[in-house]
Regions:
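Active-site/ligand-binding loops adjacent to catalytic centers
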Residues: 1-64, 80, 102-125
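Short glycine-rich anion-binding loops that position phosphate/pyrophosphate groups of nucleotides
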Residues: 8, 67, 93-95
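A short, acidic, amphipathic alpha-helical segment used as a generic capping/interface helix at domain edges
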Residues: 48, 70-79
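Short glycine/serine/threonine-rich phosphate/pyrophosphate-binding segments
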Residues: 65-73, 98
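Nucleotide donor/acceptor-binding cores
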Residues: 84-86
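A short, charged, Gly/Pro-tolerant segment at domain boundaries
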Residues: 88-98, 104-105
Length: 125
Protein backbone atom coordinates (compact mmCIF):
# COMPACT_ATOMS: atom_id res chain seq x y z
CA UNK A 1 0.00 0.00 0.00
CA UNK A 2 1.44 3.36 -1.00
CA UNK A 3 0.82 6.50 1.05
CA UNK A 4 1.16 9.96 -0.45
CA UNK A 5 0.04 13.48 0.37
CA UNK A 6 -2.84 15.21 -1.37
CA UNK A 7 -1.34 17.55 -3.97
CA UNK A 8 1.56 15.24 -4.81
CA UNK A 9 1.77 13.85 -8.34
CA UNK A 10 3.87 10.80 -7.39
CA UNK A 11 1.00 8.48 -8.31
CA UNK A 12 -0.84 10.77 -10.71
CA UNK A 13 -3.57 13.17 -9.71
CA UNK A 14 -3.76 16.92 -9.66
CA UNK A 15 -0.80 18.90 -8.32
CA UNK A 16 -1.47 21.06 -5.29
CA UNK A 17 0.15 23.09 -2.58
CA UNK A 18 2.00 21.07 0.05
CA UNK A 19 3.42 22.83 3.08
CA UNK A 20 4.95 20.03 5.17
CA UNK A 21 8.63 19.83 4.18
CA UNK A 22 9.58 16.73 2.20
CA UNK A 23 6.09 15.49 1.37
CA UNK A 24 5.09 14.47 -2.13
CA UNK A 25 6.53 15.38 -5.50
CA UNK A 26 5.79 17.95 -8.18
CA UNK A 27 7.04 15.66 -10.96
CA UNK A 28 6.12 11.97 -11.34
CA UNK A 29 9.13 9.84 -10.37
CA UNK A 30 10.72 8.06 -13.35
CA UNK A 31 11.82 5.10 -11.21
CA UNK A 32 8.32 4.27 -9.87
CA UNK A 33 6.96 0.89 -10.97
CA UNK A 34 3.26 1.13 -10.14
CA UNK A 35 2.80 -2.62 -10.66
CA UNK A 36 4.11 -3.00 -7.08
CA UNK A 37 1.38 -0.74 -5.69
CA UNK A 38 -1.78 -2.59 -4.68
CA UNK A 39 -3.56 0.37 -3.14
CA UNK A 40 -3.00 4.10 -2.64
CA UNK A 41 -3.97 6.25 0.33
CA UNK A 42 -3.81 10.04 -0.10
CA UNK A 43 -3.44 11.95 3.16
CA UNK A 44 -4.57 15.55 3.79
CA UNK A 45 -1.84 17.70 5.39
CA UNK A 46 -3.46 18.26 8.80
CA UNK A 47 -3.53 14.47 9.40
CA UNK A 48 0.27 13.94 9.53
CA UNK A 49 0.63 16.87 11.93
CA UNK A 50 -1.92 15.32 14.26
CA UNK A 51 -0.27 11.89 13.92
CA UNK A 52 3.16 13.37 14.76
CA UNK A 53 1.77 15.18 17.79
CA UNK A 54 -0.02 12.06 19.02
CA UNK A 55 3.20 10.06 18.70
CA UNK A 56 5.16 12.84 20.46
CA UNK A 57 2.71 12.74 23.36
CA UNK A 58 3.76 9.09 23.75
CA UNK A 59 7.47 9.91 23.60
CA UNK A 60 8.21 9.40 19.88
CA UNK A 61 9.51 12.36 17.86
CA UNK A 62 8.92 11.58 14.18
CA UNK A 63 8.92 13.77 11.08
CA UNK A 64 6.21 14.75 8.63
CA UNK A 65 6.86 11.84 6.26
CA UNK A 66 6.49 9.36 9.10
CA UNK A 67 3.34 11.17 10.25
CA UNK A 68 1.96 10.76 6.74
CA UNK A 69 2.78 7.04 6.70
CA UNK A 70 1.22 6.49 10.14
CA UNK A 71 -1.88 8.48 9.20
CA UNK A 72 -2.25 6.64 5.89
CA UNK A 73 -1.76 3.25 7.53
CA UNK A 74 -4.43 4.13 10.07
CA UNK A 75 -6.82 5.16 7.29
CA UNK A 76 -6.15 1.96 5.36
CA UNK A 77 -6.64 -0.22 8.45
CA UNK A 78 -9.89 1.59 9.28
CA UNK A 79 -11.20 0.82 5.80
CA UNK A 80 -9.79 -2.71 5.39
CA UNK A 81 -8.99 -3.89 8.90
CA UNK A 82 -10.19 -7.19 10.15
CA UNK A 83 -9.43 -9.41 13.11
CA UNK A 84 -5.80 -10.48 13.21
CA UNK A 85 -4.58 -8.10 10.49
CA UNK A 86 -1.09 -6.72 11.11
CA UNK A 87 0.31 -3.65 9.39
CA UNK A 88 3.98 -2.74 9.07
CA UNK A 89 4.94 0.84 8.22
CA UNK A 90 8.29 2.40 7.38
CA UNK A 91 9.24 5.47 9.44
CA UNK A 92 11.41 7.43 6.97
CA UNK A 93 12.31 10.41 9.17
CA UNK A 94 12.71 11.67 12.71
CA UNK A 95 11.27 14.88 14.09
CA UNK A 96 14.26 17.06 14.99
CA UNK A 97 14.11 18.80 11.57
CA UNK A 98 10.41 19.54 12.07
CA UNK A 99 10.57 21.37 15.42
CA UNK A 100 9.98 24.74 13.69
CA UNK A 101 7.14 23.42 11.54
CA UNK A 102 5.09 20.37 12.49
CA UNK A 103 5.74 20.76 16.23
CA UNK A 104 5.65 24.55 16.54
CA UNK A 105 2.48 25.86 18.16
CA UNK A 106 0.37 27.74 15.61
CA UNK A 107 2.37 26.68 12.54
CA UNK A 108 -0.20 24.31 11.03
CA UNK A 109 -3.06 26.78 11.34
CA UNK A 110 -1.00 29.63 9.86
CA UNK A 111 0.51 27.70 6.96
CA UNK A 112 -1.84 24.84 6.13
CA UNK A 113 -4.92 27.00 6.75
CA UNK A 114 -6.58 24.20 8.66
CA UNK A 115 -7.06 23.78 12.38
CA UNK A 116 -5.10 20.91 13.87
CA UNK A 117 -6.47 19.96 17.28
CA UNK A 118 -4.10 18.96 20.05
CA UNK A 119 -4.19 15.20 20.51
CA UNK A 120 -6.32 14.13 23.47
CA UNK A 121 -3.37 12.64 25.36
CA UNK A 122 -1.45 15.94 25.09
CA UNK A 123 -4.27 18.17 26.39
CA UNK A 124 -4.14 19.31 29.99
CA UNK A 125 -6.67 17.53 32.19
Amino acid sequence: VAVDSVGSVSFGGAPGRRMIPGLGTSVPPVFLDESYVDDLIRVEEPDPVLACRRLAARGFLFGGSTGTVVSGAGQWLAAHGREGLTAVAIAPDLGERYLDTVYREGWPEAVIESEVPAPAMARPA
